[in-house]
Structures are given as C-alpha cells and as structure tokens.
Amino acid sequence: MKYGIYFAYWEKEWNVDQKQYISKVKDLGFDILEISCAMLKNISKDELLEMKKMASDAGIMLTAGYGPNAKENLASSDPEVVKNAIAFYTDILKKLEILDIHTIGGGIYSYWPVDYSKPIDKAGDWARSVANVRTVGKIAGECGVEYCLEVLNRFEGYLLNTCAEAKQFVEEVDVPEVKIMLDTFHMNIEEDDMVEAILLAGDRLGHFHVGENNRRLPGKGGMPWYQIGSALRAIGYDKNVVMEPFVRSGGGVGSDIKVWRDLSKGADEQRLDLDAAASVAYLRNVFSGPNSDYSSVLK
C-alpha cells in the first residue's frame, strides 16, 4: 500500500497552488499527494506539465479528489446539466492523463453537498447516474484513470451511503475502471461493521480514505485501525491509502466541511507537519507492520 494526504489539511481555501505541498509531503514520509480537481478547471498544459515534473522529480504520486457542484451533477434530470457534467469530466480526465494521475475519487456520480431543501428522487437519480457514470467511466478508461465512487454519509449524499449500495451501483455500471471508494469517516456513520464493508468491496475497492470519527489524523481518536488494516490486507488491497484530515475552521474549506471549532488545538504549520508525519508512520506500522494480524477477519 502507498500512503498519502489531501492538500487541504493545511489550507482554508480549495483553489490554491497545490504544487507547494509536493516536496512537503515527501519530507514528511508520504508517497502520495492528493489534489483537488477544482484547481484544474482553469490551468494551462504547461502548468500541468510543470506539476507532473515536480511530482516525478520528488518521487511523489498524485491522486485527485473532487466534490462536484450542482451544475456538474451526473444524476440530474436536466439534460443540459448532464451535458455540462460530461463535458466537465471529459476535460478533467484528459488533464489527469497529462498529470499522470491514475485515480480520481469523490462524490463524482452526483453532487456535493446535497441540497436537502429540494425533493429527492433516489430511484430516478440512481438510474440516470448509472447511465452517465458508464459514459464517463469509459472516458476515464481511455485516459488510464480509475473512476472511484465515494460512499458518503447521509448528511452529505443520498445515492451511495453504504458499501453494499456502491457495489450494486458499480455492478450496474459494469465498466472496469469504475471502482468503489471507501472513507472511514463516512463508514463510521453508516456501516454496521467497517471490516465487513471492506471485505464486501473486495477487488472492486479502488481508493481508500482514512480519518478519525471527527476528521482528525489517524491515531488521534478511537477508530479500530488494526482491524481496518487487517481487512485491507485480507482482500489483498495494495493501492492507495489517503488521509483526508480537516482540523482547521474558517474559509471555504472549514465552511464546506462544517468544521466549526479548531480541532488542531492551535497548531501552527510546524505542528501540523509533525502531527502528519507521526500519523503516517503510525498507519504504516498498523497496516503493514509486524503487528498486523488479519486472522480475526477471516473467520
């Protein structure tokens, strides 16, 4: 497994220069920097090639995450919205190919966060999303990108709340590059048993996000990391494990993620760096170290 972190751990806004974090995450002991597709909307090919070179020179893999807005909703009943969404993803996937990014994950089958003041048509949205994700998934395949559908908690999304729903959805899409993405923060809310959810995903699991129940760094809370790591080992998962911690309030990030208090305990950038380095070292040991015992999940 390779271990990464999402750039927004250090940021209060989404649309920033994310290149600055390539060397930082390398120095802190990570293999991966996950970037937001938001910054790719208005970026030149030269800028993409510069970022690709920086990552390659540093020995850092890039992955991409995104929470699409309502105008990029593949489940929409409005044909113009769907047309716009497919055009958006086509553009983004071609840019990911230039960046040598092979994984995109997020609520990229609907939109985020959902506006629950409007009526929800889950059955209709499901059918539309399956058809349109099938189209986009084939484009992803042509670009060498796995299109990973994140299972979200009920407060942020409604189409895919459990791994069982995601597995059914992915089976209906039936495109090899369309995979399941699980996130321990969301799983902790919706899954009866996180280990069973991971086992159910099996070889359809394409991307894995980690964070504590309150979105702090792994090791800062009470998540059953040994059991989670054991389940990943049991299914032979050897892909990416990316931390998505959100610990600072304020700005667009804090508002969108609903961080209303300082979970960093007043940490400056140096303290944030030290905490991240300690967390990835902890997770490497728990998930792949000598104490990893997954016999209990194979009963």
Residues of each region from the PLM?
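Active-site acidic/histidine proton-transfer and metal-coordination neighborhood
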Residues: N15-D17, S56-D57, S76-K179, E191, ...
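Short acidic, glycine/proline-enriched helix-loop-strand junctions
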Residues: I43-L62, V145, V253-G266
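Catalytic domains of carbohydrate-active enzymes, especially glycoside hydrolases
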Residues: Q18-M39, I92, I98-D100
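N-terminal small/glycine-rich loop or linker at the start of catalytic domains
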Residues: M1-Y9, T63-S76, I108-S117
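Conserved beta-strand positions in the central sheet of alpha/beta enzyme cores
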Residues: E34, A64, G105, C148, ...
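Glycine-rich, proline-tolerant flexible connector loops at the mouths of alpha/beta enzymes
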Residues: E34-S56, I108-S117
